[in-house]
Amino acid sequence: MSEFSQTVPELVAWARKNDFSISLPTERLAFLLAIATLNGERLDGEMSEGELVDAFRHVSKGFEQTHETVAVRANNAINDMVRQRLLNRFISELADGNAIYRLTPLGIGITDYYIRQREFSTLRLSMQLSIVAQELKRAADAADEGGDDFHWHRNVFAPLKYSVAEIFDSIDLTQRIMDEQQQGVKDDIAALLNKDWRAAISSCEMLLSETSGTLRELQDTLEAAGDKLQANLLRIQDATLGGAELGFIDKLVFDLQSKLDRIISWGQQAIDLWIGYDRHVHKFIRTAIDMDKNRVFAQRLRQSVQNYFDNPWTLTHANADRLLDMRDEELALRSEEVTGELPPDLEFEEFSEIREQLAAMIEQALKIYQEQQMPLNLGAVMRDYLAQYPRARHFDVARLVVDQAVRLGVAEADFSGLPAQWQAINDYGAKVQAHVIDKY
C-alpha cells in the first residue's frame, strides 16, 4: 500500500549515491541484539560508549574470543554500526567528550524482527484488531456524515492510511514470521527423527501440537474480527460511490479489503498445509516403527543363528487353539464332535440364522399395516418389539424393524421438509426419529 514517488532507477541511484549497505555477521548481529535488549531496560533509551563496550564484552565471551583486544574490536564494531546507520552517535560536551548512542529506526526494525515480533501473542493480536475495528468504525461514521475535502482527508483517509494499513502490515508480518517458525519446527523435527526417532516421538508430538495450536489461535482471532472489519470497509466504499474526487479513498479501501482477504485466506491455507505435514510425520513414524520392529526381530534371529554354537538355544513351538472373535457376524462357530447330549440352554445358532428368522417374523407382523392401510407409527411398534428382547439385542432388532418398515411404504410428512419428533423406544435412552408411514 505504499506509494512510491520515485521510479526504480531513481531509487537505485539514490541508494548508490548514499552508499547504503548492511553487513551483519553473526557476532555483529548478536552485538546489535544485546544493545537492543539493554536499551529496552533503560528509560531514556540512550547508551554510553562504556555500556556498549560492556555489551560487546558479553558477546565476545559468548563467542569464546580473546579478551585482550575487546576494547579495540568493540570500537571497530561501534564505528561500523554507525557507518551502516544502525546507531546514531551524539557528542556531548557536558559528558567530558563521551559520546551518547541511540538505535536508529533501521536498527530498531532489525532487532524488533529478531526479538519482539517472534513472540506470538493472541492478546497482542486481539488488541491490534480491536484498535483496527475502532479506527474503521470511526472512519465509516465520518464517511457516512460526509463533508469537504479536508474532512475526507483528516477523518477518513488518514486513519485508514496511517493506522489501519500499518496494523494490517504488522499482522501480515506476524504471519510471515510464523511461516519461518513453521520451517524451523520442520527442521527441528527432521533433526530429531534422524538422531533417534524413539526418543524423538514425544518431542515431535509437542512441536506439532504447539504449532497447530498457535496457527489455530491466530486464525480464530482473525476470523472472529474479519466480518466486522469488512462490513465497515464496505460502508466506507458505499459512501464514496458517485464521488469522482474520492477515488483515492476508494482505491485505499480496495487495497485494504484485498490485504484483509489475503491475510485470512493465507491463515486457513497455512493450517491446511500444516495438517498435511502433521499427517506426513505421523505416517513416517508409524512406518518407521513397523520397519524397525521387523528389522530388530530379523537382526536378533540372524545373530542367534550365527552364534548358535557359542550360545545354544532351543525353540519351543506351541500350537494353541484358535481364538474366536464373537463380534464377527460372519464367523461360524466350530462344530466339533462331542459325546453325550447338550442341554437346550447350551445349544448355539449362527447369528445370520437368527437374523433371518427375526426378519421373517417382523415382515409377517408388519404386513397387517399394509393390507389394512393402517398408519404405522414406527416408534410405538419398535418399542413393543424391543420389550420382548434383552437389552443386548435391541440394536439388531431395531435395525431389522426399520429395514422391514421402509420396504412397506413411505411417510407423506417426509416431503414437507419438517423434522420428525424423537420418540423413546426403550427404557435405556434409545430414541428414533421417524414420521408415521401412511403411504404404501
Curated annotation (Swiss-Prot):
GO biological process terms held by the UniProt record: cell division; chromosome condensation; chromosome segregation; DNA replication
Q: Which InterPro entries match?
A: Chromosome_partition_MukF (IPR005582), MukF_C (IPR033441), MukF_C_sf (IPR038198), MukF_M (IPR033440), MukF_M_sp (IPR036141), MukF_WHTH (IPR033439), WH-like_DNA-bd_sf (IPR036388), WH_DNA-bd_sf (IPR036390)
Cross-referenced SUPFAM superfamilies, in alphabetical order?
MukF C-terminal domain-like, Winged helix' DNA-binding domain
This protein's encoding gene = mukF
GO cellular component, alphabetical, reads:
cytoplasm; nucleoid
Q: Mind listing the UniProt keywords for this protein, alphabetically? A: Calcium, Cell cycle, Cell division, Chromosome partition, Cytoplasm, DNA condensation
The record describes the protein's role as:
Involved in chromosome condensation, segregation and cell cycle progression. May participate in facilitating chromosome segregation by condensation DNA from both sides of a centrally located replisome during cell division. Not required for mini-F plasmid partitioning. Probably acts via its interaction with MukB and MukE. Overexpression results in anucleate cells. It has a calcium binding activity.
Q: What is its main location?
A: cytoplasm
**Which stretches of sequence are listed as region Leucine-zipper?**
208-236
Q: What is this protein called?
A: Chromosome partition protein MukF
Where does the UniProt annotation locate this protein? Cytoplasm, Nucleoid
Which spans are transmembrane here?
Answer: none
Q: Assembly state and interactors?
A: Interacts, and probably forms a ternary complex, with MukE and MukB via its C-terminal region. The complex formation is stimulated by calcium or magnesium. It is required for an interaction between MukE and MukB.
GO MF annotations for this entry?
A: calcium ion binding
Q: Which family does it belong to?
A: Belongs to the MukF family.
